[in-house]
Amino acid sequence: MAPALLLVPAALASFILAFGTGVEFVRFTSLRPLLGGIPESGGPDARHGWLAALQDRSILASLAWDLCLLLLFVVQHSLMATEAVKAWTSRYFGVLQRSLYVACTALALQLVMRYWETTPRGPVLWEARAEPWATWVPLLCFVLHVVSWLLIFSILLVFDYAELMGLKQVYYHVLGLGEPLSLKSPRALRLFSHLRHPVCVELLTVLWVVPTLGTDRLLLALLFTLYLGLAHGLDQQDLRYLRSQLQRKLHLLSRPQDGEAE
């Protein structure tokens, strides 16, 4: 195992890469379609209908390329999460296993965003162009995106994302505290195994709630919706555990502070 002098910078580098990728993902999924950094459609006169789009090789080529990028991300994200690959990476990278997974995921997502091809001449599923929709729909989408991202960031702070990002493993290793997950209750471990992406609803809101839903955005939203749906498997035991934890936290928050009960 590498000395702590190398472990800490490696874990921090992975975290910084993931953080920068997250910022870029906000731009890619929200700022671009809402603020028009890169147009997602070329106007009603420049676009094909759905049947004509199926015969346009340039549109089909762009969608096929985007699909390959998304599949690359999905395969990487899923394959490296399997027990066999985790055992192999743990054997050779030790406590940096999670940091390696996070870094590879960030790089795969960077490839998706950097080489994504839009389809400005493709058809749209919906578009807010006529007034008053052209004014109010983008504003409503902007508000929902802001709320969704605030919820996502809040959940990241409340959820044990230091462990999910790989920082906690290195921190505990340097201090000789062992594996962070070994200190969690069996019910918490069971929940973590079923819910490693605790921002599903908010992310789907960001993907689908846009003023103009073109073909490339539709492909992005559909594939991530399918992937997130298949990646989550909460059952009644998980829901009961979440409910009990929520009630416990609400009870702690509702308790009077010292001197307030007098």
From Swiss-Prot:
It comes from Mus musculus (Mouse). One of its GO terms (cellular component) is nuclear membrane. The chain crosses the membrane at residues 5-28, 59-80, 98-114, 134-164, 192-210, 217-234. This is Nurim. Residues 1-4, 81-97, 165-191, 235-262 are nuclear. It is a multi-pass membrane protein. The gene is Nrm. It is found in: Nucleus inner membrane. Residues 29-58, 115-133, 211-216 are perinuclear space. Keywords: Membrane, Nucleus, Transmembrane, Transmembrane helix. Its main location: nucleus. Belongs to the nurim family.
